[in-house]
């Protein structure tokens, strides 16, 4: 009986073999019979541990994929692959690249990422046809001083290494378009970085940079700049020269201001400045006419600039966890705004003009001090309106009411007015010895005063028959919290009691505090 064998075994002229994800432990023997014609060999994602001597007789190879194996050695015979154009040995266990790699003169794309390498061979810069080099996550401590000899290099990835400086010759890579230096230990960026005029993407996130050189403004073709997770205290005014920039990520730094030159970035689409120390945004940000996403989370902003209303393409605005006490009415000018988040601020009102942002679908105002919402919000087609962390549904049922201070029609619901945000345990523990501070932690004077407007005050006047006392005695009943607020208050005081009982050095106050809390929880 005859058995049909695979066509690629019959045909002696095979140019490509794909054996990825085949659980191979050894290189298949049948591959070698095609040594005269094989140009592409893909053995990625197997369990190969070594490359036999016979393997390097495949001298016609132009593309070799060996990534995601367990290869422990790259032999000097790699030099036999003189026609090799693409080599991927990423995510193996190769401790060293042989100097003989320099004989692979045709090599254009190489990926050595994810190996236990600590250095590149000195001969590496002789691979002058190399256009794309990836050496991410290999514990690389330094680059060859003559790396600038790779003058055809267009993409260089050096992410997640141990680099502390960049050799001067790096700036000779005049054709470089992508440079990824993220998650290293670089303290200074050389001024000569401004010579990389063809650079389009520059990643410097996760380093130790305290400043950027003025020369960075020379990168007229730069599209993406990521300098997040550094120690930047300021940005150079020359950043205004990055006229092609579309993405600017400067999150997690120490910035207190943004230069006015930001307004000259007319093509800027994404601006992320979260987790800094900004107290204000420059009015110039309103000149970034192409801005679609603005992230300002976790700063110290008190308000937003009026010019923000000029951002007609802005679709996502996030200013969570700041110190905002008000919003400009010009926010309604953001006619493309779909997501607006101002969670955990100090807002007491939302301007009615926000309803002019007719594309708004998500509004997150949880964790503020809002008394009510403007009636104009009913004109929006909201899909989610968040007022509380404990809100079970994205939309609530609202009632129309009247603001007795202004006479305006307003919206209210069971979650309004908002309670102030709950203090953290670390903030409470040092103060929990004082009973009055405990009360302050679970109530707010502003809430008590303003709640009167929601529920009429009830006064009980003592009978006039008591003529011996001429004083008029009254009992003022404050507004009763909604059921949801009562549960929140009960949970708050119970958590405080547990934290305080566990704290050391507070035994003397324990009975007094527990007694006070028991009275509160019992009434709830």
Curated annotation (Swiss-Prot):
Keywords: Coiled coil, Cytoplasm, Leucine-rich repeat, Membrane, Phosphoprotein, Repeat. Expressed strongly in testis and placenta, followed by heart, lung, kidney, thyroid, trachea, colon, prostate and pancreas. It is a peripheral membrane protein. SUPFAM superfamilies: L domain-like. It comes from the Eukaryota. LRR repeats lie at residues 11-34, 35-58, 60-81, 83-105, 107-126, 127-149, 150-172, 173-196, 198-218, 219-242, 244-264, 265-288, 290-310, 311-334, 336-356, 357-380, 382-405. Pfam families: LRR_14, LRR_8. This is Leucine-rich repeat-containing protein 1. The lineage of its organism: Eukaryota, Metazoa, Chordata, Craniata, Vertebrata. The gene is LRRC1.
């Amino acid at each position: 009986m005859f058995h049909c064998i695979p066509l690629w075994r019959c045909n002696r002229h095979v140019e490509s073999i794909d054996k990825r994800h085949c659980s191979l432990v050894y290189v298949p023997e049948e591959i070698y019979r095609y040594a005269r014609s094989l140009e592409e060999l893909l053995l990625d994602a197997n369990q190969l541990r070594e490359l036999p001597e016979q393997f390097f007789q495949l001298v016609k190879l132009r593309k070799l994929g060996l990534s995601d194996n367990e290869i422990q050695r790259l032999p000097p015979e790699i030099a036999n692959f003189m026609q090799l154009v693409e080599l991927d040995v990423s995510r193996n266990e190769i401790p060293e690249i042989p100097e003989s790699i320099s004989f692979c003169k045709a090599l254009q794309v190489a990926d050595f990422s994810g190996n236990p390498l600590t250095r590149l061979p000195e001969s590496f810069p002789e691979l002058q046809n190399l256009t794309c080099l990836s050496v991410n996550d290999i514990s690389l401590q330094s680059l060859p001083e003559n790396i600038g000899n790779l003058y055809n290099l267009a993409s260089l990835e050096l992410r997640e290494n141990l680099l502390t400086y960049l050799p001067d010759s790096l700036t000779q890579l005049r054709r470089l378009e992508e440079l990824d230096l993220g998650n290293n230990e670089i303290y200074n960026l050389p001024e000569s970085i401004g010579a990389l005029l063809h650079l389009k993407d520059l990643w410097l996130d996760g380093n130790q940079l305290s400043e950027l050189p003025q020369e960075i403004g020379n990168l007229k073709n730069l599209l993406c700049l990521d300098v997040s997770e550094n120690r930047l205290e300021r940005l150079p005014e020359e950043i205004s020269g990055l006229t092609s920039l579309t993405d600017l990520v400067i999150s997690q730094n120490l910035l207190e201001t943004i230069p006015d030159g930001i307004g000259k970035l007319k093509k800027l689409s994404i601006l992320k400045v979260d987790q800094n120390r900004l107290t204000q945004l420059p009015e110039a940000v309103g000149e970034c006419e192409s801005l679609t996403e603005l992230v300002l989370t976790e700063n110290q902003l008190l308000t937003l600039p009026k010019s923000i209303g000029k951002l007609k393409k802005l679709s996502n605005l996030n200013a969570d966890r700041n110190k905002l006490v008000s919003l400009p009415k010009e926010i309604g000018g953001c006619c493309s705004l779909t997501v607006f988040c101002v969670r955990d601020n100090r807002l007491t009102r939302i301007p009615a003009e926000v309803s002019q942002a007719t594309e708004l679908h998500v509004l997150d105002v949880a964790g503020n001090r809002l008394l009510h919402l403007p009636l104009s919000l009913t004109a929006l087609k909201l899909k989610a309106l968040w007022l509380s962390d404990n809100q079970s549904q994205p939309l609530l049922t609202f009632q129309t009411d009247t603001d007795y201070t202004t006479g305006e029609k307003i919206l209210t619901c069971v979650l309004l007015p908002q309670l102030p945000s709950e203090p953290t345990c670390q903030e409470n523990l040092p103060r929990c010895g004082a009973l009055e501070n405990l009360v302050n932690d679970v109530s707010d004077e502003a809430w008590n005063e303003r709640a009167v407007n929601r529920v009429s005050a009830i006064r009980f006047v003592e009978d006039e028959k008591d003529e011996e006392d001429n004083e008029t005695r009254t009992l003022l009943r404050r507004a009763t919290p909604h059921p949801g607020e009562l549960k929140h208050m009960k949970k708050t005081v119970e958590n405080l009691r547990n934290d305080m009982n566990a704290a050391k050095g507070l035994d003397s106050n324990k009975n007094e505090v527990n007694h006070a809390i028991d009275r509160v929880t019992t009434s709830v």
